């Protein structure tokens, strides 16, 4: 009887930590994602005389992971990869504004709108103002 109680306690403890271990494993795996895991196509386009980084996201980026930490890690990782690849492009500037626009698109446009157009000519505003202006302040 004591052995059964011990085994039950062990089973309960193991199942209690499954979400923790799954999130930890997934978070570690996020760092192995590459630029191509997140983006179908990224190109500079000119619209109405304004340069824009046109971003077509893949499902890896727009998927709802059901865990804010995992979602945030994907957003952060993907933006770092995007910035590292394009920050030396002649049209890239205003990184903070680009980051706000990107975050807004990831969080609110997701897969409902593609491409996402990040415009480096836009000034940096607060994130709440960026949201109010539908990601392009």
Can you say where each PLM-predicted feature lies in the sequence?
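A generic structural signal for short, solvent-exposed coil/turn residues
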Residues: 19, 45-47, 96, 110
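N-terminal export/targeting and maturation segments
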Residues: 23-65
């Amino acid at each position: 009887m004591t052995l059964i109680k011990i085994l039950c306690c062990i089973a309960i403890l193991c199942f209690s930590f499954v979400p923790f271990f799954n999130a930890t494993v997934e978070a570690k795996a996020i760092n192995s994602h590459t630029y191509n895991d997140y983006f179908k196509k990224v190109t500079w386009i000119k619209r109405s005389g304004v340069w824009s980084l046109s971003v077509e996201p893949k499902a890896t980026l727009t998927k709802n992971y059901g865990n804010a930490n995992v979602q945030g890690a994907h957003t952060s990782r993907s933006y770092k990869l995007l910035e590292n690849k394009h920050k030396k492009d002649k049209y890239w500037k205003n990184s903070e504004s680009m980051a706000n626009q990107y975050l807004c698109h990831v969080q609110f446009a997701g897969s409902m709108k593609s491409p996402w157009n990040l415009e480096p000519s836009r000034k940096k505003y607060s994130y709440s103002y960026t949201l109010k202006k539908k990601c392009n302040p």
